[in-house]
Amino acid sequence: MIQAQETLTFDDVAVDFTWEEWQLLAPAQKALYRDVMLENYSNLVSAGFQASTPEVLSKLDQGEPWMMDDEIHCRTHSEVWKVDGHLLEHLQKKRVEKRLEQWLEQNPLDNSGHQSRALFRHNHDVFDLHGRSVTSNSSLLSESLNCEIKRAAEPPADGKSCPYADREPFHPELLSTKSQLMEHQHTKQMKKSHVCSECGKAFVKKSWLADHQNLHTGEKPHRCNLCGKAFFRKFQLTEHQRMHMGDKPYECTDCGKTFLKKSGLNVHQRTHTGEKPFICSECGKGFIQKGNLVVHLRIHTGEKPYTCTECGKGFTQKTCLMAHQRIHTGTSPFVCGECGKTLSQKMGLIKHQRTHTGEKPFECSHCGKGFIEKPQLVIHQRIHTGEKPYRCSKCGKSFRGKSVLNKHLKTHSVKKLPPSVKSPQSSVVLQEKNLNTVTMHLPPLAPQLPVGISGLLANRSTVLVGQPVTRWLPTGDNRGLAQERTLMNSVNVVVPSVVNYILFYVTGN
């Protein structure tokens, strides 16, 4: 038999572990590891490759992991975890198979190499299946693993029985994920010796502690030389400076929009996927980021932490307070380039500019009607759904929009002046065109005397409305009454026999 050009050794087919990784394995997993490694060793010997030292066999037989030295531990640690989501990933598999293929090219008549390659693939696949990390659907994964293990445990074509057919399957939930193991190892290797004297929080590096202490002192040592804005930490300044340079390295693959931060890209991508992981526990409404949920919860709690120092009005968001304060200062920094109109908020400018461009980006899926603002679309869609979420607390009537409800509530706020026989005065209520109600008091009137209202209703055409009055035909000097008749289109104005107020409705000049 012709020897291969390159010798295949046991460490080429071994799955290496660090001590911390080995401690995470259950006894059944360690047993399967030992059997797989011994099987690989047997395949090497049967294929004619150089065998390992007896020390290796002794360690495997005692159930200890095959570890070369500290340098190998570091190399294996970085390679095994290269593929996220797999606890045990044998990245040397292709290299080993390539060596086996080279050996087979030199030994075309020898069948042991084919068996060795097949068994190696079989052992690697069996062990790799048990190295999968836990997914969100652990029950489905376990079922899938059991099926794959059963198929992998079928005897090979040469009639040999698989040594793992009767072994208890691995439970993937016993294994940890890459991030958990890395965090565990990092914590053990690096001591957090730098402790904050204010809150007791510990840090690995002194510079991290210094940045943290700035939060307590309020100091912002990292200042932008372009706009003067200061930051607690240097990386915050670096991200801020990208804004001045126009550098947005994170691009959305769906729409091409770019972002300063990766976190901003992650949040934006949820607008494409429709994912809303932050759910309100009160009403069930979902949000794409936690900050929006925090602001929304203030609607339920009534909390308004941002208060205007000028008028005391409260707001749920700081941006709303800043926009409100511009009313007091008179500043309107956002100017429309078309008509020169100034607005206090940037979003207000964007909406206003759509009136010039005719853009209506929010389209109804039912009838195709477009709207400038999303709230307009939401209210419009309630026409199709029949939803009327705003209910009047006075009469129970429901409305599609809050603004319509507010107008309706004004009808309940109109005060009716009831008659009062005890009152020494009479009231005349004048309803103006602009719907403002004016109440005017008149001195008490003697019975059987006409009401002189020419001064009150001069130059106006009026119609007498209200409760019926007792007709009274005046006697004596009727010159004043004649003037009143002319003013009131020949309608007799008399003093009511019971009530002492008269309601006049102004119909025009």
Curated annotation (Swiss-Prot):
Zinc finger (C2H2-type): 194-216, 222-244, 250-272, 278-300, 306-328, 334-356, 362-384, 390-412
Domain KRAB: 8-78
Keyword Membrane included in the entry's annotation: no
GO MF: DNA-binding transcription factor activity; RNA polymerase II cis-regulatory region sequence-specific DNA binding; zinc ion binding
Key words of the record: DNA-binding, Metal-binding, Nucleus, Repeat, Repressor, Transcription, Transcription regulation, Zinc, Zinc-finger
Top-level taxon of origin: Eukaryota
Subcellular localization, as worded in the UniProt entry: Nucleus matrix; Nucleus
GO cellular component, one term: nucleus
An example Gene Ontology biological process: regulation of transcription by RNA polymerase II
InterPro entries registered for this protein in UniProt: C2H2-ZF_Transcription_Reg (IPR050717), KRAB (IPR001909), KRAB_dom_sf (IPR036051), Znf_C2H2_sf (IPR036236), Znf_C2H2_type (IPR013087)
Entries under CDD domains matching the protein: KRAB_A-box
PROSITE patterns listed in its UniProt record: KRAB (PS50805), ZINC_FINGER_C2H2_1 (PS00028), ZINC_FINGER_C2H2_2 (PS50157)
Physiological role: Transcriptional repressor. Binds to a specific sequence, 5'-GGGxxxCAGxxxTTT-3', within GADD45 intron 3.
Assembly and binders: Interacts with BRCA1. Interacts with RNF11.
Protein family membership: Belongs to the krueppel C2H2-type zinc-finger protein family.
Designated name of the protein: Zinc finger protein 350
Naturally occurring in which organism (per UniProt): Bos taurus
Gene name tied to this protein: ZNF350
